[in-house]
Amino acid sequence: MQSTQGIERSGEHGRVIVAAVRIRGLVDVSPEVNHTLNLLRLRRRFTCSVYVLSDSIKGMLKSVESWATWGELSRDTLIQLLRRRGRIVGDLPLTDEYLKKYGWGSVEELVDAYLKGEVKSLWCRRGEGPRMINGKASCIPGLKPFFRLHPPKGGFKGSIKKPYGAGGELGYRGLDINDLILRMI
């Protein structure tokens, strides 16, 4: 099984962004694991959430490694994820026109600011509005904090009951998460 020690390195722009994808379903989940999956916003199969890596997130991901997979997200994959699967309230797609209302020129500009740490979170918490900093919103109101994905094209390469390092699909997979997400978009 691969160690999670490799995720300590700094990201391309200074922050390490991880994506978590729930692989297994809803049956036979212990209450503790189910609670952690809910906190990670992985409430159903093939949903994806994006986080800035911290010790608490790392511990939560470690506790759900039998139900989900995760790894470092690249800039290009995050852009594709927001463009093709990003949704706002009302299940409308996230567009550049919507971002322009909040001062952002494009998804690429928002992602670059997020990776550099200029934007703390991509979405606003419920009941919170964005703070305007230099004419740009600190978060995008109405953006859903999870992404609904398809099953991967071509299927899974391994068993969904084994860890990634043992020929399966679960647990930490490093940069290979980008390939999986692109197949699921």
From Swiss-Prot:
InterPro entries: Ribo_uL30_ferredoxin-like_sf, Ribosomal_uL30, Ribosomal_uL30_arc, Ribosomal_uL30_euk_arc, Ribosomal_uL30_ferredoxin-like. It comes from the Archaea. The keyword Secreted does not apply. GO terms for biological process: maturation of LSU-rRNA from tricistronic rRNA transcript (SSU-rRNA, 5.8S rRNA, LSU-rRNA); translation. GO terms for molecular function: RNA binding; structural constituent of ribosome. SUPFAM superfamilies: Ribosomal protein L30p/L7e (SSF55129). The keyword Calcium does not apply. Pfam families: Ribosomal_L30. One of its GO terms (cellular component) is cytosolic large ribosomal subunit. Part of the 50S ribosomal subunit. This is Large ribosomal subunit protein uL30. It comes from Caldivirga maquilingensis (strain ATCC 700844 / DSM 13496 / JCM 10307 / IC-167).
